[in-house]
Amino acid sequence: MKKHLLIGSMILAASVFVAFSVGKAAAPLSPIEELGKKLFFDKALSSPAGQECAACHGPSVGFTGPAERFNKVGGVYEGALKGRFGNRKPPAASYAGESPKLHLDKEGNFVGGMFWDGRATGDALGDPLAEQAMGPFLNPLEQNMPDKKSIVLAVQKSSYARLFEEVWGKSSLDAGKNVDKTYELIAKSIAAYERSAEVNPFSSKFDAFWRAAKAKGLKVETIDAATAKNFRNLGLAEGEINGLVLFNTKGMCAVCHVLSSVNGKPPVFTDYTYDNIGVPKNPDNPFYGQAKNFNPEGKAWVDKGLGGFLETVDKYKSLAAANMGKHKVPTLRNVAEWPSPDFVKAFMHNGALKSLKAVVQFYNTRDKAGAKWPAPEVKSNLNTDESGNLGLTDDEENAIVDFMKTLTDKR
């Protein structure tokens, strides 16, 4: 079972609804954050042009997948080239900046990195978030740019080329011998925007509650049925407080989606570790039908998650088997953010589940006789400590969902 002491290691350290306005109440962006925003929303940085980062990380849905036509089925998004799809659902681009470099903690758990499988380790740039930003542009299943030079040349032609050199210095936008360095600066700029208060405003109903509790000397991470009365009249409704209590106790959600504060800020609801919670295959995943040069296994392909990445790293190969099927614990912030009440979001790394209620039901009843969930995609390394048969009632499941809805930022 994971321990909350993992927080100690954490302290180290797109079609999109383009008309949607983000961060109206946030502080003005700094020059590097503004540069990162322009890069994030630039449709010229794909081949063919037309796909920006926001195509998969839309602000109207918590900076994750904004297109219902994909969410309703595979949950995986089409790249710049029609018919090409990746293999996993877009993770949230917000509230990710505190993730440390991928490493083993004292308990032998992998912590940190970016992407569902942790492959943006942070070893190259010292920043997993920036390393993640370097991936999609050159991925033939995503933005499909042919090389770094093409990306830099596109930025040179952009309306924000001058801003780039104001931020990084004269002649910094170099597509010649320093193209690798320039590409790193592009990624670091995007990471700066993704860390900005516009993307991470901490403005939800829960945040107001958390600050009110802190002002009274109360620690939200300690809430249980016996102490719940102390947290009343601080901004959450009675049902939402009940959901929080269940989230932190019987539901065992907070073991991984931790309530502990990091760097004095409200919690981001992840411990940045990896788990195999037994998610079944998503039969609608379009990656199964991709060309053999992208998916030689076809429908037999299995998502090995972290273990699959560790197999490719010499120093970690011996640990790959123990991490097969594990995927990164995502933030829960803005899991209930959508442009309309009937909007369908996809959940889990492969988009297999389509509602928060289904997610909670899965955690609660995965191993319960008669529940009839499909078999896990990867049966080894299954987490049975915090999921499978929690004994939650239907009302208790609903209360946890109601609590998660308080994590939506006001924009």
Say what each PLM segment does.
Residues 1-4:
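Positively charged n-region of N-terminal signal peptides that target proteins for export
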Residues 8-17:
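Bacterial N-terminal signal peptides
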Residues 17-411:
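Periplasmic c-type cytochrome electron-transfer domains
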